[in-house]
């Protein structure tokens, strides 16, 4: 014998053993051998083994091992479970398979829910989700809510919202309660081409049983984004619909909507901001602060709606600032660092900030949050894995390469690995779980790019841009990073480049119609919106959007204010 060979072995037969065990137990059940429990539903008797049922069902385990009378019984009667469903559950316990169809799922899911068999319950929910259509999604939503199937309920609700125009024509829609209907039409994610669709859906629902339902008109009309309707539509509505004309609350709602169109100052009110929020967010741009002149530091904030190509004003910043970082986390806008300017007679005081402000779209208010560990202007800011990163910048004395991140759960800033070089006036972006720090100044104009891997807490250099850039815009779409505009130390730029992380190379795209420095950039629906900035001769409020598919530029409505070195984000 070769003494170098192992003298033992461990044979792993788990899969074969499990299969053989299940087959053996199932044969015993089918032949009624060693069975110690009978499950009875009406006249149907199902033979089984307590230990097998208890191993897959906490309900049966509690029944057979607890202090219940069934512990000693050899027969248990069920009155609230369908016999076919119970047979399917027992079959699953012995085989690991279960047959789910449109005919069986409505009885099988409640049985699996009662008996606490999570795997079967999960498969029933997945099957129902795969069957969603405009005619059954409301019923499935109610069914899921009844049995506490949260994921299925959310999926059905999402389907209702995404397919609302088809759903609102089905029989299930007309059988909704007014409370359920109000919940649906209040949803920000309702997918409608225009708000007119929402109104017509409500009108149809009321007319289905007008005597009983007209009392709910005012409540439901309050959930329609009336300011998004045209003046012509609102006027025609008042003239043609006697139910609205005869109701004081409805008339007030229409008057408030008309004020939005005829009284621009009314648009700054909290309620108007909420009622003009587009459906299917995130679909808006938010422009914050910046400069509109050499000494003009802005606190104003405005929002752009692509649906009607228009801007409205929002609540101003607590601290006027420019050259700050901006991002969105949990549908709230964060403004970080920057330069705050305090103008007094004969003197202008500039302060490099470490302060943080957060805008809540639900209340249209700004609140102060925990300050960064370092003051930073001209910094980069991104969100990765639910945490907010502040990179580099300038503190008033030194260019920075340090990086810190904000952890919302503990409300603290913590340092992470610094960049390989100091950077200010640069851009930061997230792509494929990596943070990119692009270009900037430190203390020379740069075209270099580095990438942070959070799993390693380390940075590495990647391909450099074609142009050196400071104060430029950045956006991520279609798996690429796009940079646009800025200044190269000699001139203002109109150029745009695209980075492919798989090829690790930059490609020059079609330039903008005019150069821009201190520009804002953000992505909506795979368009790169390029906003404001400075052309080299004037501050800009103009907006262009870039279509990467056709490599073309289109004009959009300009901002209310000219802005440079400001914050722009999509939410």
UniProtKB/Swiss-Prot annotation:
Residue spans of the Kelch repeats: 284-331, 332-386, 387-433, 435-479, 480-526, 528-570
Domain of life assignment: Eukaryota
GO molecular function, a single term: ubiquitin-like ligase-substrate adaptor activity
Keywords assigned by UniProt, alphabetized: Kelch repeat, Repeat
Residue ranges annotated for the BTB domain, each copy included: 35-102
Segments crossing the lipid bilayer: none
GO terms, biological process: proteasome-mediated ubiquitin-dependent protein catabolic process
SMART domains in the record: BACK, BTB, Kelch
One of the record's GO cellular component terms: Cul3-RING ubiquitin ligase complex
Listed name of the protein: Kelch-like protein 28
Gene name tied to this protein: KLHL28
């Amino acid at each position: 014998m070769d003494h170098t060979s192992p003298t033992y072995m461990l044979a792993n037969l788990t899969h074969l053993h499990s299969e053989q065990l299940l087959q053996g137990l199932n044969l015993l059940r089918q032949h009624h051998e060693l069975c110690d429990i009978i499950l009875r539903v009406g006249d149907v008797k199902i033979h089984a083994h307590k230990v097998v049922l208890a191993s897959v069902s906490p309900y049966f385990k509690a029944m057979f091992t607890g202090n219940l009378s069934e512990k000693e019984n050899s027969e248990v009667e069920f009155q609230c479970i369908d016999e076919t469903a119970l047979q399917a559950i027992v079959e699953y316990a012995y085989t690991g398979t279960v047959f789910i169809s449109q005919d069986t799922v409505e009885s099988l899911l409640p049985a699996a829910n009662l008996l606490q068999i999570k795997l079967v319950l999960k498969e029933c929910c997945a099957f129902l989700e795969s069957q969603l259509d405009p005619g059954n999604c409301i019923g499935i939503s109610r069914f899921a809510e009844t049995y506490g199937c949260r994921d299925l309920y959310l999926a059905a609700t999402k389907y209702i919202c995404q397919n609302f125009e088809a759903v609102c024509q089905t029989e299930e829609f007309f059988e909704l309660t007014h409370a359920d209907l109000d919940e649906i039409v209040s949803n920000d994610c309702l997918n409608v081409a225009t708000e007119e669709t929402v109104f017509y859906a409500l009108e149809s629902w009321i007319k289905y049983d007008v005597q009983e339902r007209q009392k709910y008109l005012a409540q439901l009309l309050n959930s329609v984004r009336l300011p998004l309707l045209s003046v012509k539509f609102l006027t025609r509505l008042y003239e043609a619909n006697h139910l609205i004309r005869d109701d004081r609350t409805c008339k007030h709602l229409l008057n408030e909507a008309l004020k939005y169109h005829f009284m621009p100052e009314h648009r700054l009110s909290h309620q108007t901001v909420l009622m003009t929020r587009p459906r299917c967010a995130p679909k808006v741009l938010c422009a914050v602060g910046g400069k509109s002149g050499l000494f003009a530091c802005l606190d104003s904030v405005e929002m752009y709606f692509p649906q009607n190509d228009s801007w409205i004003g929002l609540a101003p910043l607590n601290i006027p600032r420019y050259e700050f970082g901006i991002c969105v986390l949990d549908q709230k806008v964060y403004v970080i660092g920057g330069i705050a300017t305090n103008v007094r007679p004969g003197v202008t005081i500039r302060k490099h900030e470490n302060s943080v402000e957060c805008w809540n779209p639900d209340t249209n208010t700004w609140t102060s949050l925990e300050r960064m560990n370092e003051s930073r202007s001209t910094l980069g800011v991104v969100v990765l894995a639910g945490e907010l990163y502040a990179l580099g910048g300038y503190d008033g004395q030194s260019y920075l390469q340090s990086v810190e991140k904000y952890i919302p759960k503990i409300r603290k800033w913590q340092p992470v690995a610094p960049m390989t070089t100091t950077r200010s006036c640069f851009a930061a972006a997230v792509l494929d779980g990596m943070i990119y720090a692009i270009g900037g100044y430190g203390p020379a104009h740069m075209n270099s790019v580095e990438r942070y891997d959070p799993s390693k807490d380390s940075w590495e250099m990647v391909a450099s841009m074609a142009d050196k850039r400071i104060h430029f815009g950045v956006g991520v779409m279609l798996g690429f990073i796009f940079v646009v505009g800025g200044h190269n130390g000699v001139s203002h730029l109109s150029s745009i480049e695209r980075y492919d992380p798989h090829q690790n190379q930059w490609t020059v795209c079609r330039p903008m119609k005019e150069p821009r420095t201190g520009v804002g950039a953000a992505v909506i629906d795979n368009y790169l919106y390029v906003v404001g900035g400075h052309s080299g001769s004037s501050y800009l409020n103009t907006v262009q959007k870039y279509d990467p598919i056709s490599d073309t530029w289109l004009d959009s409505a300009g901002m209310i204010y000219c802005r440079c070195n400001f914050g722009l984000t999509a939410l």
